[in-house]
Amino acid sequence: MSLTVSFTGELAAQCSPLISRLGHAGFPSALASGDATLWGPEAVPEASIRLGWVQPLSRWEPLAREVVALREELAGQGITRVVLCGMGGSSLGPEVMAAHAGVEIAIVDSTHPDSLLPLLVDTLAHTTIVVSSKSGGTLETDSARRAFEAALATQGLEPRDHLVVVTDPDSPLHHQAIEAGYRVFLGDPTIGGRFSALSPFGLVPAGLAGVDILAFLEAGEAARLECLSEGSGNPALILGCAIAVDNPEVDKLLLSTWESAPGLGDWIEQLVAESTGKGGLGILPVVGYGL
């Protein structure tokens, strides 16, 4: 599968020189090497510790196999349902992966009783609860964890048999999980949340739900190489220029919805909204249902 990005009209004319300039400057190769100076001198201290997402995805294959083995172990105990407690990218990525694969995963990304209570009152004997937070201190996720711990105890179930934690090393959640005896999968602190779908934060819940995460890693690595390649056809370079072009009349991104990729529009909306506008300028993403 190959990725392509194309556009026409005035936007194409505006982007073409920028694409050429970045290509001649070797931007893709510099990004692939983890060059933290690409965002300017003021950003170097932060960028230098946030570029883990450009590394080869093969690094996560051992973890993926561990997740597959855990799913088989849990299935042997009759635990086949997965609930994911996480906010933003921690839940939207795995949700899209599961929908694409045609497997079920219940998402808890709100503390509203209407979304939480039906899962708490249901029998949890056949359920794995994945608690996912990079910082390990997300209030909504922590509240959901406590609610499920209480519900499990009420049903006479041992929380450590049903809770799986995904967090960064040495976070508050990491320490709490160790103390409670939960299974723990650790992320990479150099990978930001918006880039974490093919790290433990996406792979663990999706894999436990039944997604073929090894296939996702293989496809993701092919896309990574394509998006870090030199040449004017680099899809990431083209899309980045289209979003960043200095045009006061271009400030919105209309996202269609695709039957073949349910939830993808909502995920892209969250990624673009979270990732742009840091300097007072950005793109407003809008999901156009029915378009």
Tell me the role of every PLM-derived stretch.
Residues L11-L18, P113-D114, I191-S196, L291:
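A short acidic, often aromatic-flanked loop/helix-cap motif at beta-alpha or helix-coil junctions
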Residues I49-G52, V211-A215, L225-L291:
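Acidic catalytic cores of enzymes that act on phosphate-bearing nucleotides/polynucleotides
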Residues L57-R59, G89, V165, S256-S260, ...:
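Conserved short loop/turn motifs at secondary-structure junctions
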Residues E61-R65, S110, N234-P235:
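Conserved phosphate-coordination/catalytic loops
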Residues V67-L70, E149-A151, L239-G240:
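Short alpha-helical segments and helix-capping/turn motifs at coil-helix boundaries
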Residues E72-E230:
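Glycine-rich phosphate-binding loops that contact phosphosugars or nucleotide phosphates
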